[in-house]
Swiss-Prot record:
Listed Polar residues bias regions: 107-127
Residues with PTM Omega-N-methylarginine: R343
Cross-referenced InterPro entries: CEP41, Rhodanese-like_dom, Rhodanese-like_dom_sf
Subcellular location: Cytoplasm, Cytoskeleton, Microtubule organizing center, Centrosome; Cell projection, Cilium; Cytoplasm, Cytoskeleton, Cilium basal body
Protein name in UniProt: Centrosomal protein of 41 kDa
Protein species of origin: Bos taurus (Bovine)
Residue numbers of Phosphoserine PTMs: S96, S99, S114, S121
Subunit structure: Found in a complex with TTLL6.
Amino acid sequence: MSVRRHIGNPEYLTRRIPQNPRYQHVKSRLDTGNSMTKYIEKLEEIKKNYRYKKDELFKRLKVTTFAQLVIQVASLSDQTLEVTAEEIQRLEDNDSATSEPDAEITAKTNGNGSPGEQSPSPVQFINSEGAGDFSRSTLQSVISGVGELDLDKGLVKKTEPNTKDKPYPDCPFLLLDVRDRDSYQQCHIVGAYSYPIATLSRTMNPYSNDILEYKNAHGKIIILYDDDERLASQAATTMCERGFENLFMLSGGLKVLAQKFPEGLITGSLPASCQQALPPGSARKRSSPKVPPLPAENKWRFTPEDLKKIEYYLEEDQGPADNPSRLSQANASGRDAKVPGTRSGQNLPAGGPASHQNPRSLGSGHLQGKPWK
C-alpha cells in the first residue's frame, strides 16, 4: 500500500509570517476578555516600570491610591480653611463692635482721670510727675480693654503670610524626594520635601524634625519616591531596618506617575528618562529648537485646576475596569451621538486637559470614517 503524498510542501503551513518592526506598535482593534497577549504585556510592563524583589521590608503605594489621598487631603484642608476664615471674620467683627464704645470713653477722659476733671495747664503738666505719660494707656483704659495697641489698630495693618504657600496642616503623609538636590529643583511632586539618599549616611542627625515627627506616628505615613525605584528602594530598605514601620514607597516612581497623571501632580519639567518615548514610525522627526527645561516652582498646595486634572486622569484610569468591553463603549457612544445635545462635552471637566479625549465621547461617525484608529 503506497503512501499518499500531499500536494505542495507542508513546511509552508509552519512557516511564520515575517513581522515588520515599523508596525509592531499597532494593536488589534478587537481586544476583549483575558488573553495570553494581555498577560504577557502586563508582565513586560511590570518588568519595565517596576522593580519587585523578594522579601521587601517596605510597603508599596500605588500611584492611583496616592492621587486619591491627595484629593481627600486637599478637599478637607479647603473646608477647614473656609471655617477658620469665617471664625476669624466673626471675631474681628465682635472686637470692632466692643472697641467703639471704649474709644468714646477714652476720648472723654482724655486718657487719664474722670470726665468731670479739667485738663491741667501746660505748666502744671510739665512740672507734674507724670509728664510724658499722656500718650500711654491709663489704668481705667486698660481695665476697660483699650490700650495703646488697640488705639493704633486702625493705622497698622497685620501682614499675615499666605497660607497657600505653606504645606497642608496636619497632613497625614510626609512625601520625601530621595533624589539629589538638582533633580528636585528641576522636577518634583507638589508638596514633596527634598531628602537626598546620601543624607542617610550621616553619622549625626540623619533625619530632619519632620521625619522624626512622622516616624511611627499614629495615623501618619512616610512616602519615598524617585525616578524609577532605584534609589527609593534602597532608602526605604535602610529606613525600615532602622525602625520605620509606617514607611511606603511610591510604586513606579515619577516614571509611572507621569504616564498616568501627566498634569496636576508634578511641577517642573520631567527628565528624559521619565518621558514617554514615541513608537517607531508613528511620527516623523522634525528639527525643532530645543526648549530649555523650566525649573520647578516652590509649590506646596494643589490649585483647584490641578485637582480637576487629577480627578479627570483618575477617572480615565478607572474607566476600563467599569466597562467590560470596548465594543459596548463604541455602541453606546454611537447611540449618544445620534441624540441632539450629546453628552460628550460633559465627560471632560472645566479646566481639564483638552488634548486627551474620552473614548466615550467618540461618535459613530469617527469610527466609520477612520477605521484604522
